[in-house]
């Protein structure tokens, strides 16, 4: 299997972005609400895509799944769908990238392998852009609420580490897609493309004619 340096970097960067997207999707730290002195002064609230957790000062954490009794924000519901689509789409892009690298050899149809890498790069770019939609929505709501003068400090929500990780993952996916799209190898870059089984020495035909 022939893999260029740019392809290896793109694959590594995109793999990191994919792992980061999965981790951010699982960990329930998208939004953090600090303790309210009037209700529960010891508990910090973590909100994720699937869980909501109470974290107390003694580091005791209690997490529960969202159910009908807990009102789930609309931006969180949409983020669930987008993040699942993005993680699956990135996995498919990585699979195409591996297949494209594995099948690049000059005794096969090089155009097919080149197209596989183009599709993989396009998928990485699309997934990275698609991930920005829920991230921007959630971040906008957090910032808007944080600077709302009608809310006290204890009611204000801040960005969690999972949301920051999701932003980083989205940028890594975009970077990996760009690197792959602009550095797709062409057949002439590989020595085996020149040396095909049908190649003959230049003097072979002359010897035949002399006989």
UniProtKB/Swiss-Prot annotation:
InterPro entries documented for this protein: Claudin, Claudin_CS, PMP22/EMP/MP20/Claudin
Described purpose of this protein according to its UniProt entry: Plays a major role in tight junction-specific obliteration of the intercellular space, through calcium-independent cell-adhesion activity.
Membrane topology: Multi-pass membrane protein
Record bears the keyword Transcription: no
Family in the record: Belongs to the claudin family.
Location in the cell: Cell junction, Tight junction; Cell membrane
Pfam families associated with the record: PMP22_Claudin
Residue spans, topological domain Cytoplasmic: 1-8, 102-118, 187-211
Intervals, Extracellular compartment: 30-80, 140-165
Keyword Transmembrane helix tagged: yes
One Gene Ontology molecular-function label: structural molecule activity
Gene that this polypeptide is encoded by: Cldn13
GO cellular-component term (any): lateral plasma membrane
Keywords assigned by UniProt, alphabetized: Cell junction, Cell membrane, Membrane, Tight junction, Transmembrane, Transmembrane helix
Protein's name according to its UniProt entry: Claudin-13
Disulfide bridge map: none
Membrane spanning stretches: 9-29, 81-101, 119-139, 166-186
Main location: other
């Amino acid at each position: 299997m022939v893999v260029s340096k740019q392809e290896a970097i793109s694959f590594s960067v995109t793999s990191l972005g994919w792992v980061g997207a999965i981790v951010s999707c699982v960990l329930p730290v998208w939004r953090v609400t600090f303790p309210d002195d009037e209700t529960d002064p010891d508990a910090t609230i973590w909100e994720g895509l699937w869980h909501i957790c109470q974290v107390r000062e003694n580091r005791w954490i209690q997490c529960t799944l969202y159910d009908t009794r807990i009102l789930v924000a609309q931006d969180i519901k949409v983020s669930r769908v987008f993040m699942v689509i993005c993680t699956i789409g990135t996995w498919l892009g990585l699979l195409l990238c591996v297949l494209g690298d594995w099948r690049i050899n000059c005794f096969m149809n090089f155009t097919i392998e080149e197209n596989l890498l183009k599709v993989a790069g396009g998928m990485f770019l699309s997934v990275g852009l698609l991930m920005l939609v829920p991230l921007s929505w959630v971040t906008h709501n957090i910032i808007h609420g944080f600077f709302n003068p009608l809310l006290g400090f204890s009611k204000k929500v801040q960005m969690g580490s999972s949301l920051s990780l999701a932003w980083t993952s989205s940028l890594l996916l975009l970077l990996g897609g760009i690197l792959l799209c602009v550095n797709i190898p062409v057949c002439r870059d590989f020595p085996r493309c020149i040396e095909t089984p049908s190649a003959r020495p230049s003097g072979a035909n002359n010897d035949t004619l002399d006989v």
